[in-house]
Amino acid sequence: MSLSGHTHTKEEVQAEVEAGEVQCPALCHQPVLVQECLTLLEPAIVGISRGADSTRDGAGAFFIDGTLGDGGHTQAFLHAYPALRALGVEIDPSMLARARARLTPFGKRLRYVLGWSDVFFASAYASAPASPATGRTAAGAAGVPGAYPAPQAVLLDLGISFFHYRGAMRGFSFAEEHMLDMRLDPQASQTAADLLNRLPQARLAQLFFEGGEERYARRIAQAVCAQRRQAPFCSARAFAEVVARVVPPMRTARFGKRRGVLGVLPKLHPATKAFQALRIAVNRELERLPRLLTAAFTALAPGGRLAVISFHSREDRIVKVHFRHWAKRCSCPARVPICSCGGVARASLITKKPLVPSCVERAANAASRSATLRVIEKR
């Protein structure tokens, strides 16, 4: 479901952010598809309001931002629904500190959890069913404090904050000289440099192809192995220079031409997809995503909605497959000849096709240009 012409590929449009072309004061991050998220999650939030339907203030509803970042989406929801309670989950301590500062005015309406979202949802909700009387679920292990009500709305924004590219100094961007780290969790054991310096050539090629859909994956892996025999990789710039020597320059991308709004992206850095793939591997993003989707969907209250914003085609395919599976009348495996699940769909697709940002938003916020939004409602 496109809001405008969408002629560029997802893998190409991230480059403007990574190349440092986006200008943003104080390293702020502009959340994407905010109005679309507010609109599509509104029925779940307002529908649960107890005696407050006329004011539509979200009374009695609980919202979880499973990828809090610096709090842009959560801020919008708390502004829109003055009685809404919320919880933000974030793995990066520096980002959580930024979110706390930004969201201080909302006081006790908002709680925070430092940790991976998939771990939080699994430990807080999957260990026990919700009580029909209270809607609450007993909290599990992994240091999750207290008990949380089943959420009416969950939002997952799978993108990386602008702060990570321009302010975190962990090697997410090839525009500046930083240590090649790329960990969202500073306690994680492996950095991006560790992977580049230790993985065999075949595994590196697989990493670049699967995480970045990089057509020159084998060529990059060969160049990396040749370079590390001379000196180990330490900086993001060193890796970017190696990739640039073996990958041809990419073409300029355009968007919105059919609708009369023309946007032009600069020529993309050859290392764009390789950096994306390396970041995904370091943080095990594609490995975590199926667990996160399943646990977040399980946590939802009946009638609750899950919204997921993804930024590259591999992520979006995973989201699409899971959503379609839950919306099927029969969810039995293909090898089972007779339906044993009862033939009742567990959810309804709210977005039959993914929503993408409008031409106006893409022109104003380069980071939004590869975003897609899918929403599902639990029955």
From Swiss-Prot:
A Gene Ontology biological process term: rRNA base methylation
Role, per record: Specifically methylates the N4 position of cytidine in position 1402 (C1402) of 16S rRNA.
Keyword Iron-sulfur: no
Protein name: Ribosomal RNA small subunit methyltransferase H
PANTHER family reported in the protein's UniProt record: 12S RRNA N4-METHYLCYTIDINE METHYLTRANSFERASE, S-ADENOSYL-METHYLTRANSFERASE MRAW
Top-level EC class as recorded in UniProt: transferase
Family of this protein: Belongs to the methyltransferase superfamily. RsmH family.
Keywords: Cytoplasm, Methyltransferase, rRNA processing, S-adenosyl-L-methionine, Transferase
Reaction equations catalysed: cytidine(1402) in 16S rRNA + S-adenosyl-L-methionine = N(4)-methylcytidine(1402) in 16S rRNA + S-adenosyl-L-homocysteine + H(+)
Pfam families to which the protein is assigned, alphabetical: Methyltransf_5 (PF01795)
HAMAP family, alphabetized: 16SrRNA_methyltr_H
Single GO molecular function: rRNA (cytosine-N4-)-methyltransferase activity
Nucleotide-binding found in the keyword field: no
Compartment(s) of residence: Cytoplasm
Family annotation (InterPro entries): RsmH, SAM-dep_MeTrfase_MraW_recog, SAM-dependent_MTases_sf
UniProt organism field: Treponema pallidum subsp. pallidum (strain SS14)
Binding site for S-adenosyl-L-methionine: 71-73, 90, 121, 157, 164
GO cellular component, one term: cytoplasm
Documented EC number(s): 2.1.1.199
